[in-house]
Amino acid sequence: MGMTLAEKVWADHLVRKGSDGAPDLLYIDLMLMHEVTSPQAFEGLRLAGRTPRHLDQLIATEDHNTPTVDIDKPNPDETSATQLTTLEKNCREFGVRLHPLGDADQGIVHAFAPMLGLTQPGMTIVCGDSHTSTHGAFGALAFGIGTSEVEHVMATQTLSLKPFKTMAINIEGDLPAGVSAKDIILAIIAKIGTGGGQGYVLEYRGRAIEQLSMDARMTICNMSIEAGARAGMIAPDETTFAYLKGRPHAPKGEMWDQAVEYWKTLRTDDDAVFDAEVTLRAEDLEPFVTWGTNPGQGVAISGVVPAPDDFADATERSAAERALDYMGLEPGTPIRDIPVDTVFIGSCTNGRIEDLRIAAEIMKGHKKADSIHRVLVVPASSRIRLQAEREGLDRIFKDFGAEWRNAGCSMCLGMNPDKLVAHERSISTSNRNFEGRQGKGSRTHLASPAVAAATAIRGTISTPADL
């Protein structure tokens, strides 16, 4: 019987097959690190008197706690400052490569690695961060791990794991105009639920996926974890190879040719069998937005806020009641009638150059609505920021009335100065809309960059077609 893409990558990295129910031992090609989940791992190495096994397969950056303004000034938050200085100290002591705040290659961990060509097809990639699934857009098996596992990888370059199940997510047909990768993944999560992918590697397939750019593919794989999955993957193709060619850490010369030859084998075999399969028709999709407090509570923008009675399952009904109360929404309210206070464009989900271009094209020649308190545009990496400035996108954002920031996780999460206040409502291109995610009492609607930009113009949740 044939193998799926995930099974092929797993088999290529199998050090030892587990027996009698024991986990396999898997080799890890690359581990990415940041300031939040690494301190205890370094301390564990220190206490055990160990050193990293392969320094050239470890790389760190500062992203979660970093300010996006006044980056040359002391961090005002003591806890954040401590985590950043601790990472810098640990990397110096153990010899781990670090791209700190202010470095030309600094950025969100899942944005800077692909841009440097560190992320490549067929690799196993881990990080103490759930959105490591982003790198699966290249045909890598990439997943988040806990802090104790971070220590284990530093010490051994391996992990003990039981094989993941596999699920095919087929997006058949062609996407309608105005529908983006973010709309696809939000629709998928709404369909299968936030636990629908639990224990699975999701492989995204179909013509609609194949037509996406690498930036768009990363958006989809990034949010696999919001469906409960361990990882998300897309088979590498000519789009993948074109993105990687010439990047600093991509293979060169004959090594490039050999790599591409191998990468072309990384496709699910025709006779492979998935453990589960889900199919959506691309032409049925439309711009999507969340209304509640988990990424699965979403609807098409043409719809209305649902009522608890719309849910047959008692648990979902109870969750809807709580979400409506927290979000301050009434059932039956048209999504387009929901006013927004703040717009956030950024994160490891939608802070790449393509996302910024889309937002800038919509904002060009407009001004933000008077009712909008602020619009934050935060590139996912320093390289993306520089590229956007070379293209003049920063001037469009500033003319519009937006704040153009330095790279970082920013308002995706309340771990840095970019936060919402209680009951402030945002439309955000990030990945999570949990209670308090963007600050205590914050209310978050997840959407695409196009929807966020249009909303900033009109003041209520909108699409570019509404302008």
From Swiss-Prot:
GO terms for biological process: L-leucine biosynthetic process. It is an enzyme of class 4 (lyase). [4Fe-4S] cluster binds at C348, C409, C412. The keyword Iron applies. Pathway: Amino-acid biosynthesis; L-leucine biosynthesis; L-leucine from 3-methyl-2-oxobutanoate: step 2/4. It catalyses: (2R,3S)-3-isopropylmalate = (2S)-2-isopropylmalate. The keyword Iron applies. It comes from the Bacteria. Binds 1 [4Fe-4S] cluster per subunit. Transmembrane segments: none annotated. PROSITE patterns: ACONITASE_1, ACONITASE_2. InterPro entries: 3-IsopropMal_deHydase_lsu (IPR004430), Acnase/IPM_dHydase_lsu_aba_1/3 (IPR015931), Acoase/IPM_deHydtase_lsu_aba (IPR001030), Aconitase_4Fe-4S_BS (IPR018136), Aconitase_4Fe-4S_dom (IPR036008), IPM_dehydratase_rel_enz (IPR050067), IPMI_cat (IPR033941). One of its GO terms (molecular function) is 4 iron, 4 sulfur cluster binding. Heterodimer of LeuC and LeuD. This is 3-isopropylmalate dehydratase large subunit. It comes from Bifidobacterium animalis subsp. lactis (strain AD011).
